[in-house]
Amino acid sequence: MKFTALPFEVGPVHFVGIGGIGMSGIAEVMLNLGYKVQGSDIKANPNVERLTGLGATVAIGHKAANVDGAGAIVVSSAIKPDNPELVAARAAKIPVVRRAEMLAELMRLKFAVAVGGTHGKTTTTSLVAVLMDAAGVDPTVINGGIISAYGSNAKVGLGDWMAVEADESDGSFLKLRSTVAIVTNIDPEHMEHYGTFDVLRQAFFQFVENLPFYGFAVLCTDHPEVQSLASRVEDRRVITYGQNPQADARLENLKMDPSGATFDVRFRLRGQDETVWRDIFLPMMGEHNVLNAVAALATARELGLTEAGAKTALGQFGGVKRRFTRTGEWKGAAIIDDYGHHPVEIAAVLKAARQAATGKVIAVMQPHRYSRLHDLFDDFSTCFNDADSVLVTPVYTAGEDPIEGADQAHLVESLRSHGHRDAGATTRDAVAADVAKRAGEGDVVVCLGAGDITLWAYALPGELEALG
């Protein structure tokens, strides 16, 4: 089975915002398949540099002239209707393709595993990819994060399968037609698009219902919303996973130490003999990451993965950039960068940090979007219980206007009123000094957020050293 349906004659494909983590993966796959790819972004970044090295032409800044000669332009939901390139393309009658539509076009030509869920998609997609490799499947991969084993968020494989991250944020994941659908969890998020939690629930149900009759869903029944979803699926095969005693792939005997997790998985699938894969090691912290690994194991086992192959692949798993990534240390304190920006994610990451630390856990948290902070304010006020100290930065606006009561000062005040003993405000200039007052041997400092706090996390070890 080969990529043949999308004609090369379509002309240069122009990606607006080509450096974004979602767009860059599709662009990289298309480049490696031989398509002519160009694009633009507001600034250069490692994704832009990687794509340029592969042959893409990338303009810095958005200008109408950038789309001259393009055969089609690809946009994500982050691109506003008044973007000059989008306006120019429509005026010139150049086809405009949504990101998910282009991803669906690539998926249409392969069997595909699509990983959905409010949290854990990127790590789970990465784990699925490396386990599919271990099963000899050689998948094409398009992910929402940099997979350490690939040095990229994408790769073209020679096999018949794909592993992709299915982004539910704007509902466009329903355009994807996969063979396998994984759902890790379902929490209230992206309400600016869905309006109500019931609409989001229905979207995930439709995501599973879109499977062909020969496909299957892999659903985490440790999560009440996903367990409810599983009960509604009547016409498609379902494999459940989790610590739930009723799960088809049950996590057992989980043990954690600072090097990672060791665990067993008991498989009890209809029509198969019960089997147990024992003493699997995953060099990642956190129960949430182990559950992601169980989802990947349950999926790849259906594609031919053996127990020995699973142990080798997971034991060598290098992780995903911005998922509990160590950026350095200072006086025995580890500095961690993590993408967690939703209260559920933050709580899971801090629980993992608590397991890794022999001392204190210090959270440096950059709220991402006023709307998210506003909609989930009470949850943000109570998700830092595993942190001894919380330093809150100004909100990363992502282009949003301020919302009354949803800002740095109000969050700090709310954390204190909810009983947190050491919650305070910090800034880019003050963060090193604020951390230095608190951090020491055996501590873990976790920089959390989906904005530019990742730059803070990588600069922090050097800035702390400069303080002495």
UniProtKB/Swiss-Prot annotation:
Subcellular location: Cytoplasm
EC annotation from Swiss-Prot or TrEMBL: 6.3.2.8
Reaction equation(s) it catalyzes: UDP-N-acetyl-alpha-D-muramate + L-alanine + ATP = UDP-N-acetyl-alpha-D-muramoyl-L-alanine + ADP + phosphate + H(+)
Record GO biological process: cell division; cell wall organization; peptidoglycan biosynthetic process; regulation of cell shape
Major location (coarse): cytoplasm
Keyword NADP: no
CC per GO annotation: cytoplasm
Residues bound to ATP: 117-123
Biological role: Cell wall formation.
Protein name from the UniProt record: UDP-N-acetylmuramate--L-alanine ligase
UniProt source species: Maricaulis maris (strain MCS10)
Lineage, highest ranks first: Bacteria, Pseudomonadati, Pseudomonadota, Alphaproteobacteria, Maricaulales
